[in-house]
């Protein structure tokens, strides 16, 4: 018998493992309305540029922190088929994001100090969905860098085919509170210059109605970000990376 997610069950999948948490600390006041997450649970996730910092180190692991400092964040993602709302098993889920200083692992020439992280693999990892379509990651709340609102990249593959490349986002007020109250974000000496409301990639993904907003719950110092990601297994991702996206904006070099 095929297991199908109703809208109610899809919503429950979003909040699985978080509903029992007492909402204290910075996440409490910023949790998105559950009904909003549930209504869009079976709607295709909007794609977004892969960005310039994707790597495929084939790191099959749930804890991707590698000791990087920051506010603890657990990711709970559920991958489902958009039409019937059925969980997708054996899908590979890649996630990657910057650290509290806005740096990605594995690349040179980053930031105002031209920092190199080549040879490092922090804040990257891969998990494979089980029969329930779920994966979890232990990470930290991402920092910021010029021109972008805080986000986490995600890529989903099935049978060696990339089905979707996207980015996941946070409630704006929560980011402000984390960055204003928690180390090491408070010691950076600069401030974010971009929010959800003026981030072009966020808006191009449909904004808060694009199925890209993480539902946040928390207890104490630990946050949990949950999202049901609906995909169409018959499609192939149209996002081939940062340069492909850039050429689409400015034309051939």
List each model region and its residues.
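N-terminal secretory signal peptides and thylakoid transit peptides that target proteins
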Residues: 1-18
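Alpha-helical and His/Cys-centered functional microenvironments
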Residues: 13-16, 27, 155
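Boundary at the C-terminal end of the N-terminal hydrophobic targeting segment
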Residues: 27-29, 35
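Beta-strand-dominated extracellular/periplasmic modules and repeats
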Residues: 35-207, 230-252
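Extracellular beta-sheet/turn segments enriched in Thr/Pro/Gly and aliphatic residues
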Residues: 63-66, 213-217, 222-233
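Glycine-rich, charged/polar anion/phosphate-binding loops
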Residues: 154, 212-213
């Amino acid at each position: 018998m095929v297991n199908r997610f109703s809208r109610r069950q899809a919503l429950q999948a979003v909040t699985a493992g978080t509903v029992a948490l007492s909402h204290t600390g910075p996440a409490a006041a910023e949790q998105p309305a559950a009904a909003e997450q549930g209504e869009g649970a079976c709607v295709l996730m909007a794609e977004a540029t892969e960005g310039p910092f994707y790597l495929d180190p084939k790191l099959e692991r749930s804890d991707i922190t590698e000791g990087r400092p920051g506010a603890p964040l657990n990711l709970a993602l559920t991958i489902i088929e958009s039409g019937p709302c059925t969980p997708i098993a054996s899908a590979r889920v890649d996630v990657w994001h910057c650290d509290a200083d806005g740096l990605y692992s594995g690349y040179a020439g980053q930031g105002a100090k031209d920092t190199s992280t080549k040879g490092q693999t922090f804040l990257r990892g891969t998990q494979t969905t089980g029969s329930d379509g779920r994966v979890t990651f232990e990470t930290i709340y991402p920092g910021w860098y010029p021109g972008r609102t805080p986000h986490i990249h995600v890529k989903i593959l099935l049978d060696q085919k990339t089905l979707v490349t996207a980015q996941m986002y946070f409630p704006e007020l929560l980011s402000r509170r984390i960055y204003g109250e928690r180390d090491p974000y408070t010691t950076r000496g600069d401030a974010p210059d971009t929010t959800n409301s003026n981030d072009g990639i966020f808006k191009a993904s449909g904004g808060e109605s694009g199925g890209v907003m993480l539902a946040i719950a928390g207890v104490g110092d630990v946050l949990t970000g949950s999202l049901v990601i609906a995909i169409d297994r018959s499609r192939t991702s149209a996002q081939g990376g940062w340069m492909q996206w850039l050429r689409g904006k400015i034309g051939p070099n």
